[in-house]
From Swiss-Prot:
SUPFAM superfamilies: Homeodomain-like, RmlC-like cupins. This is HTH-type transcriptional activator RhaR. It comes from Pectobacterium carotovorum subsp. carotovorum (strain PC1). GO terms for biological process: positive regulation of DNA-templated transcription; rhamnose metabolic process. Activates expression of the rhaSR operon in response to L-rhamnose. HAMAP family: HTH_type_RhaR.
Length: 284
């Protein structure tokens, strides 16, 4: 198999204010297309709005508001197909953090499976975290002793609050969730199963028109388009790592007709599912 491409390496001296600072915030409002890269620092990525394709260690994620990633220094990732994507990267040098905290648990690194480093936030969690991130953004632009300590203390607060409010992408609907959060959770849980938006709204006594409009405003996509993107990202993952037939993969990703799946996949990525899979097969 061909050697994995490492891409660009982002250096600490280009992103941290001084060699004393161990925490920084890289604001990306918007986040442009950015090529494959890795770092010599770790980062916590929080997506606020818009959408894009996050390719992380060769696994595709269709990201939008509420997605959160714990990215380690050795991870390789890129951003593609971005549309109004806004996110913050909270950068930190793990081995230079001085506060007595269980950093390995609060900010899981490369020793944890990738599936345990992708989480989602609801509206309440996003509002709470955004306030702390904004405070850190201001504090980390100073290098006096008190500001350095305050920056690390704010990172600890962010890590604790993230652990409190985060949930897995396929988490069941939460009874106290906001309408938009409930819809996002339902869509993430409907990759393999049919999803009927009108029935969902009727079941929860939501205004379909209002919710549809708010979803488009926050994500930059319609509900059907977002669900299709989730399904296509799952298909990309299965085509890379699973040996099931194209038809079986189509069914697992919510497409009843494998021919239709092939057409949609080709329209999205410019290549057929079988040709895409061929790229990742071992070459003798």
């Amino acid at each position: 198999m061909a050697t994995a491409v490492r891409g660009l390496k982002l250096q600490t001296e280009d992103y941290f204010l001084t060699d004393k600072n161990v925490v920084m915030v890289a604001e990306r409002h918007p986040q442009p297309v950015f090529p494959l890269h890795h770092h010599d620092f770790d980062e916590l990525v929080i997506v606020w709005r818009g959408n894009g394709l996050h390719l992380w260690n060769d696994v595709p994620y269709r990201i939008t508001r509420g997605d959160m990633f714990y990215v380690s220094a050795n991870d390789r990732h890129s951003y593609e197909s971005v549309h109004g994507l806004e996110l913050d990267n909270i950068l930190y040098i793990r081995n230079r953090l001085t506060l007595s905290a269980d950093w390995q648990r609060l900010l899981p690194g490369g020793e944890h499976p990738q599936s345990q480093r992708h989480w989602c936030l609801g509206s309440e969690g996003m509002d709470t975290l955004r306030e702390k991130v904004d405070a850190l953004r201001q504090e980390c632009m100073k290098s006096d002793a008190l500001s350095l300590q305050l920056s690390e203390a704010l990172l600890l607060q962010i890590a604790l609050l993230a652990a409190r409010y985060r949930h897995t992408p396929d988490n069941p609907q939460l009874a106290d969730a906001h309408q938009l959060d409930m819809l996002m959770n339902a869509l993430r849980a409907s990759i393999a199963a049919p999803f009927r938006f009108e029935a969902f709204c009727e079941q929860h006594h939501f205004s379909a028109r209002s919710l549809r409009s708010r979803f488009k405003e926050q994500t930059g996509m319609s509900v059907p388009h977002y669900l299709r993107q989730l399904r296509l990202c799952k298909a990309m993952e299965l085509l890379r790592y699973d040996l099931q037939t194209i038809g079986d993969i189509a069914a697992l990703c919510g497409f009843e007709d494998s021919n239709y799946f092939s057409v949609v996949f080709h329209q999205a990525f410019g290549v057929s599912p079988s040709a895409y899979r061929q790229r990742f097969l071992n070459v003798e």
